[in-house]
């Protein structure tokens, strides 16, 4: 089986956006009049569940009263504005290991797509600063503001694969957020998680980014593959352990 498409997230995958996300969350807390302040560990813990773009939701109770929803939405909007201002003022550079994977994959004939739940304007700012006019030549599809909450087969991964004519079994998604990884798995893609890991009381990020060569070895391993499913069934989630 081939790797025809690799989907990359932006947060924690192509860019280290942790510092601006942390600053944006704390600024939004302050604007909302909340006393809570996060450190990097708290942000990573929330991001592991909600993704970095919506990590601030980790500060909210699971069943938010209706009267508080507008305040919560305003806080999320404030966070997005603070984040956008931060990445425009001090643009983060693309991570070297991710760039190496992109270059190796493209050299092997693989398409690279971007799917992120960051607002489209923020995604555009990050990519434009890092790649300039090469964005359209490097990335086959760029989707910002993606929603990962839809029914399986209807989300951003399924739409992108349909547009470029690739089967889910020939595509891999690499992300640091559970919502994106879950949506990719439900769409039948292989997935690689580089999400922050829980080690006792500590939440830490992976030390290494997977290489394209390692990705191919994992994908081609007979231990990674399951028996074929009938065409009428949705492919079972398949996760490659980096």
Spans of features found by a protein language model:
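A broad detector of the eukaryotic-type serine/threonine protein kinase catalytic domain
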Residues: 61, 84, 88, 110, ...
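A short helix->loop->beta-strand "cap" motif at the edges of active sites that frequently abuts
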Residues: 109-110, 189
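Asp-based, Mg2+/Mn2+-dependent phosphohydrolase catalytic module
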Residues: 2, 99, 103, 119-242
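Charged linear interaction tracts used for macromolecular binding and regulation
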Residues: 114-117
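Conserved SAM-binding loop
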Residues: 14, 112, 173-174
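N-terminal helical cap/lid subdomain that shapes the substrate entry/recognition surface
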Residues: 3-96, 107
């Amino acid at each position: 089986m081939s790797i025809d498409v690799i989907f990359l997230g932006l947060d924690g995958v192509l860019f280290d956006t942790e510092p601006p996300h942390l600053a944006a969350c704390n600024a939004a807390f302050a604007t909302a009049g909340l006393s809570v302040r996060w450190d990097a560990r708290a942000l990573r813990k929330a991001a592991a569940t909600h993704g970095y773009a919506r990590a601030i939701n980790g500060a909210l109770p699971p069943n938010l009263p209706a009267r508080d929803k507008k305040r919560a939405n305003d806080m999320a909007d404030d966070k997005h504005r603070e984040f956008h201002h931060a990445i425009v003022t001090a643009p983060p550079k693309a991570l070297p290991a991710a760039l190496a994977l992109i270059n190796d994959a493209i050299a092997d004939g693989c398409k690279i797509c971007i799917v992120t739940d960051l607002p489209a304007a923020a995604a555009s700012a990050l990519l434009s600063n890092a790649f300039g006019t090469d964005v359209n030549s490097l990335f086959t599809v760029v989707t910002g503001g993606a929603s990962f909450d839809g029914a399986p087969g209807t989300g951003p991964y399924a739409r992108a694969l349909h547009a470029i004519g690739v089967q889910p079994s020939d595509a891999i998604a690499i992300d640091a957020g559970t919502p994106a990884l879950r949506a990719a798995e439900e769409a039948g893609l292989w997935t690689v998680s580089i999400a922050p890991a829980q080690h006792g009381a500590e939440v830490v990020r992976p030390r290494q980014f997977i290489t394209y060569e390692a990705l191919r070895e994992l994908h081609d391993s007979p231990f990674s593959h399951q028996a074929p499913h009938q065409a009428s069934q949705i492919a079972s989630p398949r996760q490659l352990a980096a």
